[in-house]
Amino acid sequence: MSSTQGALVGVGPPRFSIKRAGPPPKHRSLRGVENRWALAFVAPYAAVFVTFVVYPVAYALWLGARPSLFVELISDPLYLPTVVNTLFFVGIGVNVTMFAALLLSGFFLRPRRWIRLLLVPYLLPWAIATVQACVSFHWMLIDQRGLLDGLLSALFEIDGPLWFNHRWLAVGANIIAFIWKWMPFWTVIFIAGRMTIPRAIYDAASVDGATGVRRFVHVTFPLLANLYLICTLLTTLWALGDFTTTYLVSGGAPALSSHVLATLGFHYAFDTAKPALGVAAMMTSLPVLIPVVIVLMRRLQVREVQL
C-alpha cells in the first residue's frame, strides 16, 4: 500500500452542504408589505367584533354568573311559569311552523295561476317589518275592538274571548303570531328545496305506484330531511331569543304571566332595575341553546349536502 493510499484509508466520500437560498430581498419586502396590508384591512373588523360581540358577551357572562342570582331567580314566582311558557312557545311554535311550511311548499308548487296569485298575500306577514307585523296582530286581538272578535260578533253574534286577560290565551296568541310571521319565510325555503329535486325521481316513483302521501313520505321528505333539520335547528335558535313577538303581542299580560325568558330578562333589567338578574334569566336558556348550536354547526360542516 502506497503512502497516498494509506492516507486515504478511513476517509469517506466528500460531503457537500447545500444552503437553501431564501426569497430574494425584493420578494421578502413584498411579503412584508402584503402582511401589513392584510393586518390593516382585518384590524377594523376585529376591533368591531371585539367591541360589539366579545366584550358584551364576556361582560354579560361576568355580570350574571353569580350563584346568588340563580337562587334569587328560582325563588321568584315568575320564573318557573316563564320557563314553561318558553318551552311551549319554542316547542309548538317551531314544529308547527316548520311542518306547515313543508306542506304548504308543495301546495304552492301546483301549476295553478290562482295559487301563484295567492302566494303574494301569503308572504306579506314575513315581507313587512317584524314590529309592524306584531303590532298588527296585537290590534287584531285586542279586547272587543279587535278584528277577530269583531268578525265573530258580526258573523255569529257571539263575543270573542278576551285574549290578553287569560294566561294561556295570551301565550297562544304569541305562538300564533310567531307562526304567522315566520311560516311564509320557511315556505319559500322549502319551495326552493323542492325545486332542486329532479323530476325523474318523481316519475320513477309514479311508475312504482307512489303517489300523494306515499310519494311525500318515501320520496320528498327523505330528500328534504337534512334541509328540514337545519331549518328547524335555526328556527329553534330564533325562537329561544325571540323578544319582539311576546313583547309587542301580549306584553307579558295578564299580570306578567305570559312572559318568555327573553322578555322576562328585559323586565328584570329595565322594569325592576336588576340587570344582573335579567342576564341570569337569559343564561338559563344556555343548556338548550348550546347543544342546538353544536348540532347545527356539525350539520353545516357536512361536505356532501343532502337536500
Regions found by a protein language model. Give the residues of each.
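Short, Lys/Arg-rich, polar N-terminal cytosolic tail immediately upstream
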Residues: 1-33
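A structural signal for multi-pass alpha-helical bundles of membrane permease subunits
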Residues: 34-307
